[in-house]
């Protein structure tokens, strides 16, 4: 029989101590892993059974378009180890968060940069509300042209107008020519203007049309995947014209589902798309019947569903009156703002050139009848807390 040396004996003891000291934690890890796998399996099983229920037409709430989301949610089940932010212990990480640079897409409009702190960040839903013919699509086309001029990849989804009509509006904006004159422009001059743009713009703008009230986030995701594969196109910003005439991927449009829940579902799905693809999304909505007749309105005048402004990160109204129309101006009113204080620069006026599909800044002294504007100096993206407040009553 071999004699065990003292060193070997000590090493064996240390090894046994280590095994027994880690046994409890090892068992716990194993238990968590096995439990998580079991929960995942049950979630997938339930999702498949729900999907079969939908395919057989037995679901009164969900359509077949909801199946990918149901399965995706089941596959994403996990035990999250993060149990919250510790105010004291995580102070250093929080300080780093305060000082990290956040990517923002700026406007070419001074007051819009002021109220958003220099532009809108990714993973956000930004809504413009206006009456029929006031300028919802004009705003979206103008900002899409601005983003393209910044060499950002732009995806413009239209559920209202034809692709060529949207491109026509962006042509008018970027080529600085009225829509009427576009139709009489000679081919050589048009080609020269496009080539001039091509020499300065290296990004792409893709316009995709869907039939009204038929396209949902499911279609948009498929489009994004197709563009990435076939054109190697990944958008930096997405425009959807407009939200109320999209479809929900989860809910059926029926008498059993009220407009509040249906429009809220669409808004939540589109905001989820912004988060998933790490882009800001711009869209629009109509005012309701009472708001259409008013020269000023608020969130309560949102058409069909108050769930839309509840979901959006940024919500502004475009207001037109006969007096403003005569001055070629349009009023902007902040209704919701997660980027800044919505009470500072609450109202302001922009110049509008409808023939060229353009918006532009106007001089401060030209802004009239803004009794509750609480305007601040927009210089340097004035975040609402620097500079002297200017609260003027023009009434």
Which stretches of residues belong to each language-model region?
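Structural recognition of the conserved hydrophobic beta-strand(s) that form the central parallel beta-sheet
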Residues: 239, 280-285
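Cytosolic-facing regulatory segments adjacent to core modules
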Residues: 116, 146-234, 347-348, 361
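Phosphate-binding/switch loop-helix module in NTP-utilizing enzymes
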Residues: 206-273
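The Walker A/P-loop phosphate-binding site
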Residues: 78-177, 205-207, 376-379, 393-395
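Noncatalytic partner-interaction/assembly domains of nucleic-acid and motor enzyme complexes
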Residues: 1-38, 394
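C-terminal regions of RecA-like/P-loop NTPase motor modules
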Residues: 218-235, 254, 272-277, 289-395
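A short beta-strand-to-loop transition that corresponds to the Sensor-1 phosphate-sensing loop
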Residues: 160-161, 283-288, 321
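Interdomain "pre-motor" coupling segment immediately N-terminal to P-loop NTPase/helicase cores
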Residues: 24-87
